[in-house]
Amino acid sequence: MTRRRLLLGGLGAALSAPALAQVAPRGCRGPVYLTIDTGWSREAERIAAILGRHGVRATLFVADEPTFRGDTSLSDAWAPFWRARAAEGHVFASHTWRHWYFRGDPAPGRVTFAARGGGASEVLDQGALCAELARPVEALRRMAPEARILPLWRAPGGITTPGALRMAEACGLRHQGWTRNGFLGDELDSAAHPNAALLRRNLAAIGPGEVLVMHWGVRGRREPFADIFEDLVTGLVARGLCFETLPERGVPA
């Protein structure tokens, strides 16, 4: 069986599971869709605890990235974390395995995939791209067989090429970015974008239908975004917004 068929078969199994009903609470004037990419994961437990306290379910895009513990985010040591998130009703999607970046389409059915900052790169054909997108899902499924996985993917940095989008569609996956006001800013420099400023901006700008993006922790940010995350959640709820996981076909962004 090819890796492409394996991916499509795995997604079919995921989609055959009952979808979690999402009923908007009274007073909800529209949904927002919180998505979390893996990242450095330093604040992962803190963020997960906040989500749990407020009953927020998110869509988690997984890649095998280096973490603050010296391992990688889809190594066996992280299995308890991912199992707990699946049990809480969060849903999952692929963020590529290596978290490299798409840099161009050198030929039809080919896409250049390069490590951040240069250095290693390779040209992926259709089968290799499907395998790159399938691998994090396969690793997650081994750790958390009950995890609900959506037929979506997110390119690292949100950077795509026309070829990568077409080829991923052939793997059965639709790309999911984030909306203009959904970039929460946890990757920005703390000196230029302190938490207080990010909180004010996000509470003022985010409205119904936004797809939000953040990480389980960002290595280069000295002022952890997790310090204001609970205030952001409660502030958005106070404005009548309700958190939902992404639908299977994604949301325009």
Q: Which role fits each region the language model picked out?
A:
Residues 22-28, 53-54, 58, 221-253:
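C-terminal domain-boundary segment and adjacent tail
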Residues 1-13:
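N-terminal secretory signal peptides and thylakoid transit peptides that target proteins
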Residues 159-205, 241-252:
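His/Asp/Glu-enriched short active-site or ligand-binding loop at hydrolase and phosphoryl-transfer sites
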Residues 22-110, 117-121, 132-151:
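Active-site beta->alpha N-cap acidic-glycine motif
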Residues 37, 51, 156, 212, ...:
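Divalent metal-coordination and catalytic microenvironments
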Residues 38-43, 64-77, 100-103, 152-162, ...:
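Acidic-and-aromatic substrate-binding clefts and catalytic sites of carbohydrate-active enzymes
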Residues 35, 61-63, 93-95, 153-156, ...:
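A cross-family glycoside hydrolase active-site/sugar-binding cleft signature
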Residues 14-18:
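N-terminal signal peptide c-region/cleavage motif recognized by signal peptidases
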